[in-house]
Amino acid sequence: MGMGNMNKMMKQMQKMQAQVARLQEELGERTVEASAGGGVVKVTANGRQELVNIKIDPAAVDPEDVEMLQDLILAAVNEALHQSQEMVTREMAKITGNIRLPGF
């Protein structure tokens, strides 16, 4: 591989790194929402897989059945995190051309 090709490849990698850094910043602002129990529990997560909001309909709060509410919260959180990860994977593929980078 000639030096010209090596320099070109290095520039492409630097450009990709800058795009990834910009995307990571943007993903902190993008959100996905998931719900469980017909919408009585709603969870919002950002592209960094951080929960940013949880809403629970007061009708879902039954002191006699706390376990049901816990299950609904878990289901909504897991779905929101799954959607968030899918969003990250899609956006990273646009930059990397489906090259898997560590940590994404």
UniProtKB/Swiss-Prot annotation:
One of its GO terms (cellular component) is bacterial nucleoid. Keywords: Cytoplasm, DNA-binding. GO terms for molecular function: DNA binding. InterPro entries: YbaB-like_sf, YbaB/EbfC. It is found in: Cytoplasm, Nucleoid. SUPFAM superfamilies: YbaB-like (SSF82607). Signal peptide: none annotated. Belongs to the YbaB/EbfC family. Homodimer. NCBIfam families: DNA_YbaB_EbfC (TIGR00103). Binds to DNA and alters its conformation. May be involved in regulation of gene expression, nucleoid organization and DNA protection. This is Nucleoid-associated protein Moth_0028.
